[in-house]
Amino acid sequence: MISYFNNELTTTRQISDLRFGIPIILGSNGTYEMIIAIEPLNEETFQKILEYNNSSDLKPYIAITKNRANFLKARVYDGNIARLKLPTPISFNWIKSTADPSEDFEYPLKGPYYSLREGNSNISKVAINFCKKAELLPAALIV
């Protein structure tokens, strides 16, 4: 499996894949998660992720920056990022508008947001960092 502790070439490749909307796998110590940058996410890829999620017991969530979370009035428990639970049913428009400030007027009432407190947030922090390095909105869907 690919780990974020690998060499610089692997990291550069993962950042490039995120830029093109290709999911990547990050992890360490036997815990791995699929990371999808929200900005290039399209409806087709989202539907495939939903199918995968429905066939497993995984709980996907969104990682966003502290600044975005504060604007959305979501609680921040992990330093400089917030991990948000997805609503049921999961909506493509909700995910995109939560991540993208340019859609705040199109989809004004998205809350309430429920932040994750438990679990390790290290992979989420790396995912946000990779999105920033890819020059994307710092928001990721994590499965």
Where are these regions (language model features)?
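Catalytic domains of riboflavin
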Residues: 1-143
